């Protein structure tokens, strides 16, 4: 094989379809937009949820609830994720971020009781579920709210 014999693999290169370049191309005249109407015009599209003038579903349904501006969103850590640490380790939010258990601490870290804990650990976090706190203490470890 020589340099002048190299060619791209079959099907790896596709020619861009240029519209509005003559009837023989199959995409001339109306450029694949069909005949007249809103969708044939420049910038012609209907907004999401538009139902042709009929009162749309999102306006037919009643408003519900509100957004609590004081809501704190915690980064969640489950008990089973804490098993990666050595026995007797003091698990802090900084350590959880450093080891990649948590990517973003958000408003703090909450430990939940999913899975089982097999090691005695001292866990420091911003919040604990009742089952998580109970499981940590049952293994002889300690939990501390910071």
Swiss-Prot record:
Recorded GO CC terms: cytosolic large ribosomal subunit
Domain of life of the native organism: Bacteria
Residue spans of biased composition, Gly residues class: 23-35
Classification via Pfam families: Ribosomal_L27A (PF00828)
UniProt keyword rRNA-binding, yes or no: yes
MF GO annotations: rRNA binding; structural constituent of ribosome
Keywords associated with the record: Ribonucleoprotein, Ribosomal protein, RNA-binding, rRNA-binding
Gene Ontology BP annotations: translation
Xref: InterPro entries: Ribosomal_uL15, Ribosomal_uL15/eL18, Ribosomal_uL15/eL18_sf, Ribosomal_uL15_bac-type, Ribosomal_uL15_CS
HAMAP family in alphabetical order: Ribosomal_uL15 (MF_01341)
Subunit structure as annotated in this protein's UniProt entry: Part of the 50S ribosomal subunit.
Function: Binds to the 23S rRNA.
Name of the featured protein: Large ribosomal subunit protein uL15
Source species: Staphylococcus carnosus (strain TM300)
Designated gene of the protein: rplO
